Regions:
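Fe-S-dependent hydro-lyases/dehydratases of central metabolism
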Residues: 1-876
């Protein structure tokens, strides 16, 4: 299935060019006349991939799955690219470096282990906002801290750039992978060996669908699946539900696309689109700019979906020109899209499994919070929802008069994330609001740590062109870096005085950010909750200083005549925003940023070793253990004890947090023993190349609720577990160490939507290294389920209506799993009670494909790689 260009009979000249393409319409209609016209956009792209890459013997059967909408069979997909950020991308390359060692140990040639598919690694997850936006040297200082803390990691990444073929690296300080993908890396239509075809990619981040806005299928996957694709293997899938979402109407004046996407997130969550591929269409969709479309597509994982596509149209071409793409490439996109039936006008007869309607004119000004992206709250309802509170606001003013912070203090206000900074309208809107606030004499509250972290250097250029960067800087929103920063939990340290006051007074402190996630504990350990909002609202909340403030009604200050100044007095008109965007955002800005960034130098120096020289004292990069000992041995699915019994909506932030490492944590204690000063502990995310540090992050979230951790008759929140049979509650890491010493196989019992959130492979690696053999839950998030399989952990799904509560599981039990492990087979979870009784519970084996069964039985993706490579080498 891996040989390229398999079905030459469908290879045709692309009209008006010297290139060829594969005529997918002919291939599909040869099976069922007229079928191509009814296929959704995504099915057409998947069909082209099959026609171009699939074994001819399997082509008709695979295409029939798309035509007949069959969801019971597997078919291969070969993405054109892999895009990575430096956390999961680095851990993937650490795994490949470890695989090279394993191959060398077995007598193979390690230099033969290379990515086959072009892989782009962007260093964007390492920068913490240690110096805020009101520090004029914040950018340089934050970059210096980033380089110092991450020397080990960057040394390894630099080695990979030279040691591996097909790996391009964008160094730190240049932007966010998704925004760079949107503005530069995606050509929309690829050309290789004289053949034009749709650009597609997988990315090691759940927000990879950001570039779906361009009509590019881009799917977020875990690091393990990305490794598989890198090495040239097909990504096997079953056809998902493809749901059409018709966007009608036009947004009301003053409504941003952030407001729209937060409303859409609530709407689509309620419509249960989990795992589906969404296609937006209709007059409302056609009128949205690519910036607005990207804001929507970015939050695909928050919808619960896999992809959120827009088709190619004039907006696409205009955006490609705006961002400095070559005119020949823009014309190729138009020519190919119209020839291949990917142009928006060619989709009138598409048939979807479901069609939903969403009226853009119904959207009001929104936020999301205080702890989930789909928990929308209209700003007009803040008081009714108990967030804005007149009494607490008055008390807070008295506290401020005494030099104290108010209840509900906004301690972090961050314009952050590709969700919004890739949308010029949102950035310019915030800057104009800042200008108006400055003119009115308003200022940021002194306890607010404010920051601006664009996902692209082009943002700085167009803000300067508009004369607005200084307006943001005046309010404390200077540029602190070009990276993910606060959105990824890298908000940096608070002022020590402010932090101590929060601790001493047990203050309810919050964050407001223009990001895409606000799970408890994600943004900062001392921000008890967080709200998502448009960049303009972030600026407004920095002025207000507290979430007890009714942002629509309360006065942000007074003018020279003593008249109250409210949000509507500061909010810029849509006409002004559009005029500034049109005058200030220019193609030459993008060319100035990206032309030098993507001119990769060929270095002719001393040959570099194919094996990495591991540093024994490193706490960032360490040879992985996945080919050694029990991890490479037989599975033991009997006598398992529960490590945790969990409720619904357990996120990968619960399973393996990304934010700052505290000195009191297990990881912090380990780093101190290794000689690191506390100020250089960095984040959990940055240490994921060292399993000895990273495994100590397993369930290290202080917001974890493990129902086994009962103290004085009540479940205690925290990184806690109960060791059985003693019944002793202790810190999670100590419990894991205890079970590891006993060689005790473990299981996790959980509720619905287990593993939602970031595509974090360490959420699976951590539990596997702890000795977890299986996880039984009411449901799994897609990426996390594949990561579990990639690590050799068996996902089991309870039947509808069966839960840990109906089964009365309290953690004293032991568990066996019996039955033949086949795709979606019914297995039996045998529960052994402490009183000697047994309960036989049917569960669904969530190894969904034959390929997943094969990976699991091999012990995981990495073990499977080694086996296949050595077998192929011996047979050569």
């Amino acid at each position: 299935m891996t040989s390229p260009l398999m079905n030459e009979s469908y290879r045709k000249n692309l009209p008006g060019t010297a290139l060829d393409y594969f005529d997918t319409r002919e291939a599909v209609d040869a099976i069922q006349p007229g079928a191509y016209a009814t296929l959704p956009y995504t099915s057409r792209v998947l069909a082209e991939n099959l026609v171009r890459r699939c074994d001819p013997a399997a082509l008709e059967a695979s295409l029939r799955q798309l035509i007949e909408r069959r969801q019971d069979l597997d078919f291969p997909w070969f993405p054109a690219r892999v895009v990575c950020h430096d956390i999961l991308g680095q851990t993937a390359l650490v795994d490949l470096a470890g695989l090279r060692d394993a191959i060398a140990d077995a007598g193979g040639d390690p230099a033969q282990i290379n990515p086959v598919v072009p892989t782009q690694l962007i260093v964007d997850h390492s920068l913490a906002v240690e110096h805020p936006g009101f520090d004029k040297a914040a950018f340089e200082r934050n970059r210096a801290v980033e380089d110092r803390r991450n020397e080990d990691r960057f040394h390894f990444i630099n080695w990979t750039r030279k040691a591996f073929k097909n790996v391009d690296v964008i160094p730190p300080g240049n932007g966010i992978m998704h925004q760079i993908n949107l503005e530069k890396m995606s050509p929309v239509v690829q050309v290789r060996d004289g053949v034009a075809f749709p650009d597609t990619c997988v990315g090691t981040d759940s927000h990879t669908p950001h570039v779906d806005a361009l009509g590019v299928i881009a799917i977020g996957v875990g690091g393990l699946e990305a490794e598989s694709v890198m090495l040239g293997r097909a990504s096997w899938m079953r056809l998902p539900d493809i749901i059409g979402v018709e966007l009608t109407g036009r947004p009301q004046p003053g409504i941003t696309c952030t407001d729209i996407v937060l409303a859409l997130t609530e709407f689509l969550r309620a419509a249960r689109v989990v795992g589906a591929w969404i296609e937006f269409f209709g007059e409302g969709a056609s009128a949205l700019s690519i910036g607005d479309r990207a804001t929507i597509s970015n939050m695909t994982p928050e919808f619960g979906a896999t992809a959120a596509m827009f088709s190619i149209d004039q907006q696409t071409l205009d955006y490609l020109r705006l961002t400095g793409r070559e005119e020949a490439q823009v014309q190729l996109v138009e020519t190919y899209a119209k020839a291949a039936g990917l142009w928006a006008d060619d989709l009138a007869q598409v048939q979807y499994e479901r069609v939903l309607q969403f009226d853009l004119s119904s959207v009001v000004r929104n936020m999301a919070g205080p702890s989930n992206p789909h928990k929308r709250v209209a700003t007009s309802e803040l008081a009714a929802r108990g967030i804005a509170d007149e009494g607490k606001l008055a008390s807070g003013k008295l506290e401020q008069a005494d030099g104290l912070m108010p209840d509900g203090a906004v301690i972090i206000a961050a314009i952050t994330s590709c969700t919004n900074t890739s949308n010029p309208r949102n950035v310019i809107g915030a800057a104009l609001l800042a200008r108006n606030a400055n003119r009115a004499g308003l200022t940021r509250k002194p306890w607010v740590k404010s920051s601006l972290a664009p996902g692209s250097k082009a943002v700085q250029l167009y803000l300067e062109e508009a004369g607005l960067l200084g307006e943001l800087e005046q309010l404390g929103f200077g540029i602190v870096g070009f990276a993910c920063t606060t959105c990824n939990g890298m908000s940096g340290a608070l002022d020590p005085v402010i932090q101590q006051e929060i601790i001493d007074r047990d203050l309810y402190a919050t964050a407001v950010l223009s990001g895409n996630r606000n799970f408890d504990g994600r943004i900062h350990p001392y921000a008890k909750q967080a709200f998502l909002a448009s960049p303009a609202l972030v600026v407004a909340y920095a002025i207000a200083g507290t979430v007890r403030f009714d942002i629509e009604k309360d006065a942000l200050g007074v003018d020279a005549q003593g008249n109250p100044i409210t949000l509507k007095d500061l909010w810029p008109s849509d006409e002004e925003i559009d005029a500034v965007v049109k005058a200030s955002v220019k193609p030459e800005q993008f060319r100035k940023v990206y032309d030098p960034m993507f001119t990769f130098k060929v270095e002719h120096g001393a040959p570099i070793s194919p094996l990495y020289a591991w540093r024994p004292q490193s706490t960032y990069i360490r040879r992985p253990p996945y080919w050694e000992g029990a991890l490479a041995g037989a599975r033991d699915l009997s006598g398992m004890r529960p490590l945790a019994v969990l409720g619904d909506n357990i996120t990968t932030d619960h399973l393996s947090p990304s934010n700052a490492i505290l000195a009191s944590s297990a990881a912090g204690e380990y780093l101190a023993k290794m000689g690191l000063p506390e100020e250089d502990f960095n984040s959990y995310a940055t240490h994921r190349g060292d399993h000895l540090t990273a495994q100590r992050a397993t369930f290290a979230n202080p917001k974890l609720i493990n129902e086994m951790a009962v103290v004085d008759g009540a479940v205690k929140q925290g990184s806690l577990a109960r060791v059985e049979p003693e019944g002793q509650v202790m810190r999670m890491w100590e419990a894991i160490e205890t079970y590891m010493l006993r060689r005790q196989p473990l299981i996790i019992i959980a509720g619905a939507d287990y593993g939602q959130g970031s595509s974090r492979d360490w959420a699976a690696k951590g539990v596997r290294l702890a000795g977890v053999e299986a996880i039984a839950a009411e449901g799994f998030e897609r990426i996390h389920r594949t990561n579990l399989i990639g690590m050799g952990v068996l996902p089991l799904e309870f039947k509808p209506g069966v839960t840990r509560l109906t089964l009365g599981i309290d953690g004293t039990e032991t568990f066996d799993v019996t039955g033949a492990r086949l795709p979606r087979a019914e297995l039996t979870l045998v529960i052994h009670r402490r009183d000697g009784s047994q309960l036989m519970v049917p569960v669904t084996c969530r190894l969904d494909t034959a390929e997943e069964v094969s990976i699991y039985e091999a012990g995981g993706v990495l073990q499977r790689f080694a086996q296949d490579f050595l077998e192929a080498s011996q047979g050569a």
